[in-house]
């Protein structure tokens, strides 16, 4: 999506591509993202570093924990797990280093010993 179309769809969020002008090296910072659509996937493919939305491990995490009645998708956040989650979305993008940011305190990946943390780490996060 181009900047000219930003805000034309519900769920649009801003991500940044930060470039060192003298070297051309860059990274992406995307703290909120509802879905990794093909145009975004094409931009991220082969990147050396991406900081990405790690708000929730599962879409219904906040509901299951009794914290609120909104899903991650409704709040504009892709889940880490599942067939539409960020682990699956990044699987074939060839990103060298991936770091989750904006991790909600309800997210079990914060627990170093949790199976969710181990799944994220095993997937290169």
Give residue spans per PLM region:
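Short Pro/Gly-enriched beta-strand edge/turn motifs at strand-loop
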Residues: 1-3
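Cap/insert and terminal regions of metallo-dependent hydrolase folds
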Residues: 6, 10-15, 22-26, 34-125
């Amino acid at each position: 999506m181009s900047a000219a179309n930003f805000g034309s769809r519900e769920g649009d969020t801003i991500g940044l591509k930060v470039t060192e002008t003298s070297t051309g090296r860059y990274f992406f910072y995307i703290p909120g993202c509802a879905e990794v659509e093909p145009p975004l996937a094409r931009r991220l493919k082969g990147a050396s570093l991406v900081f990405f939305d790690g708000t929730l491990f599962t879409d219904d995490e906040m509901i299951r924990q009794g914290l609120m009645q909104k899903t991650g998708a409704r709040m504009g956040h892709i889940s880490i797990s599942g067939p539409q989650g960020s682990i699956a979305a990044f699987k074939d993008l060839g990103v060298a280093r991936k770091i989750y940011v904006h991790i909600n305190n309800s997210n079990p990946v914060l627990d170093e010993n949790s199976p969710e943390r181990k799944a994220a780490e095993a997937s290169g996060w």
